[in-house]
Amino acid sequence: MSNTKPSIVFAHGLWADGSCFSRLISTLQAEGHEVVAAQNSLDTLKGDVAAVTRALGRVSSPAILVGHSYGGTVITAAGTDDRVAGLVYIAALAPDEDETSQSQQAKFPTTDVFAHIEVADGRVWLKPDGITCFAGDLSEQEQKLVWATQGVPDADLFNQRMDGTAWRSKPS
């Protein structure tokens, strides 16, 4: 589909999936943008970068990558792709080439949500009592849905290194 407006590819963070952008997607589509939300597995950073790169292949170029939370790390690496015109970070990590998500996050105060997690079976689970810290602006029904469908990251995900730092060469 040829388009005069840039395409938009979203990358979600922990305990979420691509549907977390559903309200934005509808609005952007109504404005004439091609929009895709990548579905990150949250197993490996390399795999999540590959998911965003695959999503880039489904839309016209140029594209804008939008990352939320850990999704910022993903777009920082995926954004080196020639089809990417720019990056948007929404309350997101944007590590430099010598950083990991964890080392960048360690520079800032810990958010309340991390008092409501449990590491089990090599995954980081959000406990039910943590949903208000994570999605407090949603209705109770929406919070329950987010908790029930949470994407559960690998416990080592934030320690994995990325290749490429797109914000050094692309508008951000």
List each model region and its residues:
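Short, conserved loop/helix-junction motifs that constitute active-site signature segments
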Residues: N3, A78-R83, G164-K170
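Active-site catalytic motif of lipid deacylating hydrolases and related acyltransferases
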Residues: T4-S61, T111
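Glycine-rich His-Gly loop
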Residues: A11-G13, S69, A92
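Active-site signature of alpha/beta-hydrolase-fold catalytic machinery across serine-
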Residues: R23, A77-A78
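Conserved serine/cysteine hydrolase catalytic core
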Residues: D48-V49, E140-Q141, A148-S172
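Gly/Ala-rich beta-loop-alpha elbow adjacent to hydrolase catalytic centers
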Residues: V66-G71, I75
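Flexible "cap/lid" loop of the alpha/beta hydrolase fold
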Residues: T80-I131, D154-D163
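Pocket-forming structural segment of enzyme catalytic cores
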Residues: A120-T149
